[in-house]
Curated annotation (Swiss-Prot):
Residues 1-38 form the signal peptide. It is found in: Golgi apparatus, trans-Golgi network membrane. Glycans are attached at N119, N440, N448, N500. Residues 479-510, 588-625 are annotated as: Disordered. This is Pheromone-processing carboxypeptidase kex1. It comes from Aspergillus terreus (strain NIH 2624 / FGSC A1156). It is a single-pass type I membrane protein. Gene3D superfamilies: alpha/beta hydrolase. PANTHER family: PHEROMONE-PROCESSING CARBOXYPEPTIDASE KEX1 (PTHR11802:SF190), SERINE PROTEASE FAMILY S10 SERINE CARBOXYPEPTIDASE (PTHR11802). The active site is at S190, D389, H451. It holds the Pfam family Peptidase_S10. The chain crosses the membrane at residues 523-543. The gene is kex1. Residues 589-603 have a biased composition (Basic and acidic residues).
């Protein structure tokens, strides 16, 4: 009996027997939506990018990874594949600060391969950090930038943030397993100076528990103008202001600020385990107010003291590209290109007040307390500072280092009472800053740089990154820069050009040409081998056919066409000068030569062997059909 299914196809009794299994499978999928909704790397592939420069699009992936299913918490990422591989695969994770400020700042204004030229046009960043490392930008905590979460379920503490980030990495590596064994570096700036050490510690704890899973190879941390040690950073405001001439000592303004400073220091003594202290925030706020130009309604840019901004922003409107960012990242075409989930209802914002006001870290200790343990565990750490930043100035970072104890010493001492020297760094003939190193900690001070060092000095910042990652390569993607420490030329790193720069294009064309010639040479060799084999086979068949022809010609007779087999035999015998009377059965066997038989059937046998060989040759490797 034949019945019809709902889809109108013919279904037999055998098919009907499989229905329970089908129903069970559908029920399983219904109960496990992850089996249906699981995404692959293809779902995150960025196929186009509005305003991208002419030429091939860089290989990118972007989208959301769920980290909090209960509250639909999703972190947004934007990943760029490296342009060149040096001696090993590396992945650099970049985080901006806030808390609650988007890492799209880093992607489009600092270390990413593109910079915004205007509201809708991108241009290449000549100092992008993706030359020797895959770049992964993440908007975190949930609610930051393109990331989102239901309602007001924002995070409060550092351990929550770190747990979300570990979940993000686990899920991200499930989708992109080819990067899980990369050397991992975590970099960022500002309040990321709190995030990064906590994430690093969480990775170490995860690795200790990992049994069947690969351990993540955390190779280093880079923190720029970081908010790491409040007890060292808060008092540095006034010290830095005096050094830079923003405040005149013994002036009325100075005395007012010193009163606030003393209150702050007393709070710090009692609250040394606090990341944020309102009484200390008042010092900077009052400083910006007292140094205002009332006639112009301008105040010091707290991120770059060389600049002024309208009050009360005092730097919040900087850099000027922020105007372009706000427009570009809200375009429907861009939202579609970066695979933004429809659940993300609100438009992109650089910094979220909701995230910042909730993330108060009342139970979290400052990350400076984690640094010694991380360094002693073998993780190299690099702290770098732009010398024109006020809000996270270099004076506070240097004080942090001077007071910190790690690996059997205090600060940069190499032995009791002896400190590691400061080395002068020049880049392409110009003073670039200083380098200082001791016991697995490196400090770099950039001259003429703001809170966002890579924004001001992209090529110098990548030179720093490449040296920290121990990249040593003469010329890939551009001309190597002349970078020197105390006048001594350092190992070459390519920091001069983007893959679409003229030098890089010429280099790529040269490589392609060489590859083409190698391909032609290999093709020529293959063709020659085929021709030789063909000639040999052709010659063999010619020889075989002639031999057969001679054998058959000896029994050929013009008058044999209508004769019987016996008559043909007699004719052959007479043609061979044999007498008819000598005919017997044995002679017939002799004339019916086994050798001739084998030769006759050998042609067919060869053909069969050849067909079998052809079938074997056409089989895909691994036995796949």
């Amino acid at each position: 009996m034949v019945s019809l299914s709902l889809r109108g196809a013919r279904r037999t009794a055998k098919d009907a027997a499989s229905l329970p299994f089908l129903s069970w499978t559908l029920s399983l999928l219904a109960l496990n939506p992850l089996l249906v909704s699981a995404k692959s790397a293809a779902d995150y592939y960025v196929r186009s990018l509005p305003g991208a420069p002419e030429g091939p699009l860089l290989k990118m992936h972007a989208g959301h990874i769920e980290v909090d299913p209960e509250n639909h918490g999703n972190l947004f990422f934007w990943h760029f594949q490296n342009r060149h591989i040096a001696n090993r695969q590396r992945t650099v994770i970049w985080l901006n600060g806030g808390p609650g400020c988007s890492s799209m700042d880093g992607a489009l204004m600092e270390v990413g391969p593109y910079r915004l030229k205007d509201n809708s046009t991108l241009e290449y960043n000549e100092g992008s950090w993706d030359e020797f490392g895959n770049l992964l930008f993440v908007d975190q905590p949930v609610g930051t930038g393109f990331s989102y979460v239901n309602g007001n379920q924002y995070l409060h503490e550092m351990d929550e943030m770190a747990a979300h980030f570990i979940t993000f990495l686990e899920n991200w590596f499930d989708i992109f397993p080819e990067y899980e064994r990369d050397d991992i570096y975590i970099a960022g700036e500002s309040f990321a100076g709190q995030h990064i050490p906590y994430i690093a510690k969480a990775i170490q704890e995860r690795n200790e528990k990992a049994q069947m899973k690969p351990k993540w190879s955390l190779r280093g941390l880079l923190i720029g103008n970081g908010w790491i040690s409040p007890k060292d950073q808060y008092p540095s405001y006034l010290t830095f202001a005096y050094e830079e001439g923003l405040i005149t000592k013994d002036s009325r303004t100075a005395k007012n600020l010193e009163v606030l400073q003393s209150v702050c220091e007393s709070r710090l003594e009692a609250g040394k385990n606090k990341i944020h202290l309102d009484d200390c925030e008042k010092v900077l706020s009052e400083m910006l107010t007292k140094t205002m130009d009332v006639s112009k309604n301008e105040c010091i840019n707290s991120y770059d003291i060389r600049l002024r901004d309208e009050a009360p922003a005092c730097g919040m409107n900087w850099p000027p590209e922020l105007t372009h960012m706000n427009y570009y990242l809200r375009q429907p075409e861009l939202i579609s290109a970066l695979n933004i989930n429809p659940e993300k209802k609100s438009g992109w914002m650089e910094c979220s007040n909701a995230v910042s006001s909730t993330f108060r870290t009342q139970k979290s200790v400052p990350s400076v307390q984690l640094l010694p343990g991380l360094i002693e565990s073998g993780i190299p750490i690099l702290l770098f500072s732009g010398d024109k930043d006020l809000i996270c100035n270099h004076v506070g970072t240097e004080e942090l280092i001077n007071n910190m104890k790690w690996n059997g010493g205090t600060g940069f001492e190499t032995s009791p009472g002896v400190w590691a020297p400061r080395h002068d760094w020049t880049f392409e003939g110009e003073p670039a800053g200083i380098y200082q190193y001791a016991r697995n900690l490196t400090y770099v001070l950039f001259y003429n740089a703001s809170h966002m060092v890579p924004y001001d000095l992209p090529r110098q910042s990548r030179d720093m990154l490449d040296r920290f990652m121990q990249v040593d390569i003469a010329s890939i993607g551009g001309s190597p820069a002349d970078s020197r420490i105390d006048g001594e030329k350092l190992p070459q790193t390519s920091v001069g050009g983007h893959p679409n720069s003229t030098a890089a294009e010429e280099q790529e064309k040269k490589k392609m040409k060489e590859a083409e010639w190698k391909a032609y040479a290999k093709s020529g060799e293959a063709v020659l081998v085929v021709v030789i084999i063909g000639v040999i086979v052709w010659g063999f068949f010619i020889w075989r056919s002639r031999r057969h022809h001679r054998g058959y010609r000896s029994v050929y007779n013009k008058n044999m066409s209508g004769s019987s087999v016996l008559e043909r035999f007699h004719s052959k015998r007479s043609g061979a000068d044999m007498e008819a009377g000598d005919f017997d059965e044995a002679e017939l066997d002799d004339l019916h030569s086994p050798g001739l038989d084998r030769e006759h059937y050998a042609v067919g046998d060869d053909s069969d062997d050849e067909q079998q060989h052809q079938r074997q040759g056409s089989r895909p490797e691994g036995g796949q059909s």
